[in-house]
Design a protein with these regions (language model features):
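Extracytoplasmic gate region of multi-pass secondary transporters
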Residues: 1-51, 106-110, 114
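Small-residue (Gly/Pro/Ala) motifs that create kinks and tight helix-helix packing interfaces
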Residues: 19, 49, 53, 144-152
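C-terminal transmembrane helical hairpin of 12-TM major facilitator-type secondary transporters
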Residues: 65-113
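A membrane-interface helix-boundary motif in multi-pass transporters
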Residues: 67-70, 150-167
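Multi-pass alpha-helical transporter architecture, strongest
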Residues: 82, 86-88, 163-188
Length: 188
């Protein structure tokens, strides 16, 4: 759940603050453009990430039982460099490309959220497990926009955007630990 909570923290904070970040990074940009560029490219990238991540993990599942956790780890870890590049880039085309790739990375992670959960939870507990897992992640994620607002007030917008990488690192490590230390004993 720590991985999902950190993922939601990062993505909720990004989606709420991306348009504001775009306006502050490119003052000549109109609000409509900032909202479009701040969110559309993210979701376009996520569409392709979900498609690729899901197909990859489904294809390799029989040979690599832990592949879904591994794909989640790679997806969330790939967010880190794109968050950092996005935070400090000064070119709109490069910003758009970075947001697209950040969305792709989150899509790779997203493609296996519940499939990975089903790999380790008894079928008779899947409904309650899914509900608790999702709610727990959302509760942690709900703090993302508020913390981002605090960081925007305390630091520069670029530094506050870069701080999201910390949560992506923590989430990635949580998923890696689950794969390495608990998956083999918990797998169904």
């Amino acid at each position: 759940m720590a991985g999902l909570g950190c993922y939601f923290f990062v993505t909720y904070a990004f989606k709420v603050w991306a348009p504001i970040f775009m306006i502050r990074s490119f003052p000549e940009m109109e609000t409509t453009q900032a909202v479009f560029h701040g969110v559309f490219w993210f979701y376009l990238g996520a569409f392709f990430g979900v498609t690729l991540g899901g197909r990859l993990s489904d294809a390799l599942k029989i040979r690599r039982p832990g592949i879904r956790f591994e794909v989640e780890f790679v997806g969330l870890a790939l967010c880190i460099p794109f968050i950092l590049i996005m935070a400090f880039v000064h070119s709109l085309p490069l910003m758009i490309l970075t947001i697209l790739m950040f969305g792709f990375a989150t899509g790779v992670y997203d493609s296996n959220i519940y499939a990975a959960l089903f790999d380790v939870i008894n079928p008779r507990f899947r409904a309650v497990g899914t509900g608790l897992f999702g709610c727990g992640g959302c509760i942690v994620g709900a703090f993302g926009p508020a913390v981002m607002g605090f960081l925007n007030d305390a630091f520069t917008p670029r530094l506050s955007m870069a701080s999201l990488a910390i949560f992506a690192i923590v989430g990635s490590l949580a998923i890696l630990c689950a794969r390495v230390f608990t998956f083999n004993k918990d797998k169904i």
